[in-house]
Amino acid sequence: MNEVAAPEWTALKSGVYQDASGKAVFYGQGSVGKDEISQDRKTLSEDRARDELAKVFTSYMERLVEKILTSRSDIPLTDVNNVQLRNSIEEGAVTILMEATITNHWLNPDNGKVYSMAELDLRRLTDKLESFNSISMEDRSFLEGTIVAAHASMTNGTVGQVAMAEERIDVQPKFDRLLSY
């Protein structure tokens, strides 16, 4: 039996990356084994990829809050402002995570394992800043720089090129997904 070579992206771990074009991204990878009981292994692998992406993004958001708080040590935040900052960031994170896309699927014909890759572009977060009219231009500029710096601090210069897989499972957006939050 000839083994099929897996696409390069299946070797990437969920995490914070610069893609081959230099774009700042977050990846979440999910998989489902052939022996796992599920009527729709593709959907389950997508859900696991989104879950992984949410873990990565949550870790990133914690780093971002730390960077904001330490960068602005000259302007001490009150406890109320600190809580407001954290709450605003958490609310924005949930909205932004809903914009994540499943970019790859692959079915390993050798073992039946289904892989999915979820991606979120950092630009979604910086674009979100533009909609906050209550934030001054100076603060928006500071936040945008901090957002990019927090991402860069987590990549450690890692570049991950994600090549599209030869699709063995139909890659379609999931429009009938029920949100549990």
Regions found by a protein language model. Give the residues of each.
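Domain-level marker for long, solvent-exposed, non-transmembrane regions
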Residues: 1-181
